[in-house]
């Protein structure tokens, strides 16, 4: 059995991850961790996820459960994830990282850690989203410079980063396929007298409202026709199942920084 720890276990995504781990053959939740000031520390992780008692108590310190897991799943915040990354690197633990909002410099720290431990880092662990990335690469290469490209994403009102990590990853895939640097061609929102659109740019629009789990649309608009590639998530479970799948896939892998394209053999 693959022994899995979940960081941020008392949060919305953490509870979903606990459920996904317990539903997956070959995986078992052996540690659950949340922030030290959480009033839920000491509670049974199964009860937190409405699964009943499973005998795993919520801890407030990763070091206290260091001997209890093989791989850590972390969907928290960059500052938290980087601390956990250093711990896992020191102790030889594998990691699944679904945290978004990293800077370029912070992403380099992930790459450095990948020299010592196996890591799967992805902006989105949904199988459908990762298939969409493959389709986006194909569409961008075929359509080339003859279309205007816009990326529209929507998430719940509690999401703290914008655009979403998934939207940015979609932009990177499209830009790379076209031989462009996303940092140079991205346009984040528009206001006022913007003038005619530059076809070399890639536009981003963000919606934050209600309880939207995650909607992403990439629009390729030409004269006379347009192509839209859309993915809509209706449950966090799709991300959680993908993360657990990645955790099982990492078993026995050499050190390296992988992503879901590797897990799904889409390269």
Curated annotation (Swiss-Prot):
Q: What is the active site of this protein?
A: 155 (proton donor/acceptor), 159 (proton donor)
Pfam name, any one: DapB_C
Example of a GO MF term = NADP binding
Q: Which GO terms describe its biological process?
A: diaminopimelate biosynthetic process; lysine biosynthetic process via diaminopimelate
The positions annotated for binding NADP(+) are 35
PROSITE patterns reported in the protein's UniProt record: DAPB
Please classify the protein's predominant subcellular localization into one broad category. Answer: cytoplasm
- The protein's name: 4-hydroxy-tetrahydrodipicolinate reductase
Q: Which gene encodes it?
A: dapB
């Amino acid at each position: 059995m693959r022994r899995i720890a979940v960081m941020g276990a008392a949060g919305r995504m953490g509870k979903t991850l606990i459920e996904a781990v317990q539903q997956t053959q070959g995986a078992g939740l052996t540690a659950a961790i949340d922030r030290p000031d959480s009033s839920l520390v000491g509670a049974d992780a199964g009860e937190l996820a409405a699964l009943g008692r499973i005998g795993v108590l919520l801890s407030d310190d990763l070091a206290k459960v260091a001997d209890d897991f093989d791989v850590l799943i972390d969907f928290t915040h960059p500052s938290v994830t980087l601390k956990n990354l250093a711990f896992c690197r020191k102790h030889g633990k594998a990691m699944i990282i679904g945290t978004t909002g990293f800077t370029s410099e912070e992403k380099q720290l992930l790459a450095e850690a990948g020299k010592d431990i196996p890591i799967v880092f992805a902006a989105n662990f949904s199988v459908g989203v990762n298939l969409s990335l493959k389709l986006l690469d194909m569409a961008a290469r075929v359509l080339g410079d003859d279309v205007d490209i816009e990326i529209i994403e929507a998430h719940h009102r509690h999401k703290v980063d914008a655009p979403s990590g998934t939207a940015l990853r979609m932009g990177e895939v499209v830009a790379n396929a076209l031989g462009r640097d996303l940092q140079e061609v991205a346009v984040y929102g528009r206001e006022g007298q913007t003038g005619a659109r530059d076809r070399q740019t890639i536009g981003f629009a963000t919606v934050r409202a209600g309880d939207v789990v995650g909607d992403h649309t990439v629009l390729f608009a030409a004269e006379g026709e347009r192509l839209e590639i859309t993915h809509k998530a209706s449950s966090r479970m799709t991300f959680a199942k993908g993360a657990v799948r990645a955790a099982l896939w990492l078993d026995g892998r050499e050190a390296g920084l992988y992503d879901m394209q590797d897990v799904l053999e889409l390269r």
